[in-house]
Amino acid sequence: MKKRLLIIVGPTAVGKTDTSIILAKELNGEIISADSMQIYRYMDIGTAKPNEEEKKGIPHHLIDIVNPDEEFSVAEFQKIAKNHINRLIEDEKLPIVAGGTGLYINSLIYDMDFTQSISNWELRGALEAEAREKGNEYVYNKLKQIDPHAAARIHPNNLKKVIRAIEVYEETGEKIGDFSTDLNINQEYDVFFVGLTRDREELYDRINMRVDAMIEQGLIEEVKNLLSLGYDKNLIAFKGLGYKEIIGYLEGAYSLEEAMDILKRDTRRYAKRQLTWFRRYENIHWYNLSNYDSCENLAECILKDFKGHFNSL
């Protein structure tokens, strides 16, 4: 018998946290976060982590597991998340995976083998040096020659992704896009897959209000504290939404109002990319929260469909 798994995805600020907590209470579940920013300690406000009161006594896993200067790969997520899933099933609890990081979700629903890590630090260093000496465009043109399809999808100034695509090609002879297609569904789990969305204007309003709330809650102080602890502003963790904008403000690159406007704009764009990613999934049950009075009413509908799915097997 396959292991039952509930997965909840959707764009940032849509209501995944509240919905997943309600469902966890009703289904005797625990939550496994699939958010690549909530893994970091000391980064709470900018990552919208639920506090203890908001968790309502529901255990949450894969939150606060590494420091901001530590690396954490999709492979590591997959390993730890599966360990939690298997333990919860043994304890007769329902694992509920909730989050908006598409690669994390892919690692659970597809048969993705990370045993052979694709990396070439020497090549990476050489490409970074070339970018410093000759500019990002020079390195980008290398990618265009070997993988024009990837180049068309990556901005020339997104040096990290440009180098990664070159690195994968040089190490495997395969184009990076080939690793995200023709994936086989993981037969280990019987997944009830939930996708949450809202009407666009409502979602964008929620994003704007979330940014305002983050500033009021102390996001600027949180960033200052991280820097005072000695964490380098160039760390991957600081590339996340909310942190890079506030660092720009602190360095005088723009005013606080400008930083907030940039953060709101970039978060809206990120939400759009998330929806594009999740809409590629098959067998996903979509729910528009704009059609419900509350997350509680939505949860009732999801519960009915969830039980119907497994009763029909």
Curated annotation (Swiss-Prot):
Source domain of life: Bacteria
Name a biological process GO annotation.
Answer: tRNA modification
- MF GO annotations: ATP binding; tRNA dimethylallyltransferase activity
Residue positions binding substrate = T12, A13, V14, G15, K16, T17
Residue positions binding ATP? G10, P11, T12, A13, V14, G15, K16, T17
Q: Report residue spans for region: Interaction with substrate tRNA.
A: 35-38
Pfam families found in the cross-reference section: IPPT
Key words, A-Z:
ATP-binding, Magnesium, Nucleotide-binding, Transferase, tRNA processing
The EC number of this protein is: 2.5.1.75
Site (Interaction with substrate tRNA) at: T101, R124
The subunit structure is:
Monomer.
Which family does the record claim for this protein? Answer: Belongs to the IPP transferase family.
Function noted in UniProt: Catalyzes the transfer of a dimethylallyl group onto the adenine at position 37 in tRNAs that read codons beginning with uridine, leading to the formation of N6-(dimethylallyl)adenosine (i(6)A).
Protein's name according to its UniProt entry: tRNA dimethylallyltransferase
Task: Give the originating organism.
Answer: Alkaliphilus oremlandii (strain OhILAs)
